[in-house]
Amino acid sequence: MARKGILGTKLGMTQVFDENNKVVPVTVVKAGPNVVTRIRTPERDGYSAVQLAYGEISPRKVNKPVTGQYAAAGVNPRRHLAELRLDDEAAAAEYEVGQELTAEIFADGAYVDVTGTSKGKGFAGTMKRHGFRGQGASHGAQAVHRRPGSIGGCATPGRVFKGTRMSGRMGSDRVTTQNLKVHKVDAENGVLLIKGAIPGRNGGLVVVRSAIKRGEKA
């Protein structure tokens, strides 16, 4: 079955009860409505993909090139525009320009991958950023308790290797959490209740796609 996807907004976390009266932590995602603005095919573009637009925005805030893209599709401008790759041309044939996608593309119990931008933490040390254990708390350790330690020899190699884990800015990265279960689809309100936590802040843009590793499960 072809992978499905939709753009949405993370609203926050809450908890609900399942059929066994057990508490289930869920993230509430406002999913869609999305509108299809373009369909890419192997013959014309070299690959299969669908372009989705989501979110309200004043037309005066959209520049002319982007406005032209929306005009060609015959839809009003949206705040977010994203392209989702498809498996093949047959999957692309399931979409048409101007089509509207809502939360109903997913079913209760489906497994999804959720992509978002993680919260920014600012400049962080190695213990917080990479999980270093730090230096000893006693036995002669003085004012080095949270330092990373050696990052390389003076003469050999005489440089710091690329990729060495050091202090730096943490967060604000594109993160995907895989194999999350859709606990409930609220079609009336266009909301997905996804079991567990997803990346990003409340109000942030997320992409919800069918799980690539285990597929859908009704």
Swiss-Prot record:
Listed under subunit, the entry gives: Part of the 50S ribosomal subunit. Forms a cluster with proteins L14 and L19.
Q: What Pfam families does the record tag this protein with?
A: Ribosomal_L3 (PF00297)
Which BP terms from GO are recorded? translation
Chain spans, region Disordered: 133-158
Return the PANTHER family for the record: 50S RIBOSOMAL PROTEIN L3 (PTHR11229), LARGE RIBOSOMAL SUBUNIT PROTEIN UL3C (PTHR11229:SF16)
Q: What's the family?
A: Belongs to the universal ribosomal protein uL3 family.
Q: Does the keyword rRNA-binding apply?
A: yes
The record ties this protein, via InterPro entries, to: Ribosomal_uL3, Ribosomal_uL3_bac/org-type, Ribosomal_uL3_CS, Transl_B-barrel_sf
**Name of the protein in question:** Large ribosomal subunit protein uL3
Gene coding for it = rplC
| GO cellular component terms, semicolon-separated | cytosolic large ribosomal subunit
